[in-house]
């Protein structure tokens, strides 16, 4: 067995052991994160609102933090929509 095969075997073994241990903390996939207390689960799934910053290309007006897009010339002289 060469080094690469050994490393792959160890990764597979670690994955299998990790899955077995994970089953102990969750009853089923529908229950998701029942074993986490409320605050920890909120930290996992908390996401900041995503918006496009000023002078970045924008396909839609609602993606801009400012809420509006205008056509502006880029460095090549082409007109592109950019957030205000």
Curated annotation (Swiss-Prot):
Cellular component per GO, a single term? extracellular region
Q: What is this protein called?
A: Omega-hexatoxin-Hmo1a
Any GO molecular function:
calcium channel inhibitor activity
One Pfam short name: Omega-toxin
> Which cysteine pairs are covalently linked by disulfides here?
51-65, 58-69, 64-83
Task performed by this protein: Inhibits insect, but not mammalian, voltage-gated calcium channels (Cav).
Signal peptide start-end: 1-22
Where is this protein found? Secreted
Output the superkingdom of the source species. Answer: Eukaryota
**Residue stretch(es) of the prosequence:** 23-45
The Swiss-Prot or TrEMBL note on domains reads: The presence of a 'disulfide through disulfide knot' structurally defines this protein as a knottin.
Its GO biological process terms? defense response
Keyword tags: Calcium channel impairing toxin, Cleavage on pair of basic residues, Disulfide bond, Ion channel impairing toxin, Knottin, Secreted, Signal, Toxin, Voltage-gated calcium channel impairing toxin
Note whether Secreted occurs among the keywords: yes
Q: Which residues form a coiled coil?
A: none
Q: Mind telling me which InterPro entries this protein's record contains?
A: Omega-atracotox (IPR009415)
What is the tissue specificity? Expressed by the venom gland.
Site positions (Critical for insecticidal activity) are 57, 74, 82
Recorded family membership:
Belongs to the neurotoxin 08 (Shiva) family. 01 (omega toxin) subfamily.
């Amino acid at each position: 067995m060469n080094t690469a095969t050994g490393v792959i075997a160890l990764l597979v073994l670690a994955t299998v052991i990790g899955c077995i241990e994970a089953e102990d903390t969750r009853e089923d996939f529908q229950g998701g994160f029942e074993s986490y207390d409320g605050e920890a689960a909120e930290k996992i799934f908390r996401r900041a609102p995503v918006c496009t910053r000023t002078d970045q290309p924008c396909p839609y007006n609602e993606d801009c933090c400012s809420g509006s897009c205008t056509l502006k010339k880029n460095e090549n002289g082409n007109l592109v929509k950019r957030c205000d």
